[in-house]
Design a protein with these regions (language model features):
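Short, amphipathic alpha-helical segments that act as regulatory/interfacial helices
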Residues: 128, 192-199
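Short alpha-helix plus adjacent loop in nuclease-associated cores
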Residues: 144-161
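Acidic, divalent-metal-coordinating active-site segment for phosphoryl/phosphodiester hydrolysis
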Residues: 183-194
């Protein structure tokens, strides 16, 4: 109920009715897993430098449909610490896209599908940082956090246990193949695999 009310007021702020499809009822059994690489961990001051996303339809990752964009930082420069994490240098972004163009392309890609991610709130906050000034809204899509599903799954098996929610731990525990970490597209693929592994487990219920 709260989500419906929130989306009602969110939609009223939409500056361009072309994007009203975002508020349509979510497509059943279709999801978008996405990940952002950024200049840092503060949505207030840091910028997105890459977005990677994949579509899941039913129980299949649709490999023919992917979203990968590199973006020129708007306000921040890359520091040594962040380069060590994602291995993206300023020279790699010299021909990057403008963030406003990428945000609009991203909206077309995700449509009204449910969003899936690992620590998804951070990535959504980064997207919303640019989306709100651009279109007046925040992402209205239904969202699923894989670390929450994994946590509930492990607690069900061993009540009151400590659950390590590090991405690498989850990947290894679920026997997900490891690709290069801190690459937005690779991370979105691995997150999609985590989601499908959990979704299809008999003891897991996706709310």
């Amino acid at each position: 109920m709260f989500k419906k009310i929130s989306n009602y007021f969110n939609k009223k702020k939409l500056k361009d009715k072309k994007y009203s499809f975002l508020f349509d009822k979510h497509l059943k059994n279709e999801y978008v897993c996405f990940d952002c690489e950024t200049t840092g961990l503060d949505p207030q001051i840091d910028d997105i430098i890459s977005i990677g996303a994949v579509i899941i339809k039913d129980n299949t990752i649709v490999s023919s449909k992917k979203f990968v964009r590199y973006i020129k930082p708007k306000n921040c420069s890359l520091d040594e610490k962040s380069i060590k994490i994602h291995h993206i240098r300023e020279c790699d972004l010299k021909n990057g896209c403008e963030i406003e163009d990428v945000i609009l392309e991203f909206l077309e890609f995700i449509g009204n599908r449910t969003l899936v991610g690992y620590f998804l709130d951070f990535d959504k906050n980064m997207i919303n940082k640019y989306l709100k000034p651009l279109l007046g809204i925040t992402l209205p899509n239904r969202s699923i956090e894989v670390s929450e599903i994994y946590h509930d799954f492990k607690i069900e098996l061993i009540p009151q246990s400590f659950v390590d929610l590090k991405f690498k731990t989850i990947v290894n525990d679920l026997d997900i193949p490891e690709f290069g970490n801190h690459d937005s597209y690779n991370d979105s693929i691995m997150t999609a695999m985590i989601f499908l592994k959990l979704k299809n487990h008999p003891n897991v219920k996706i709310k």
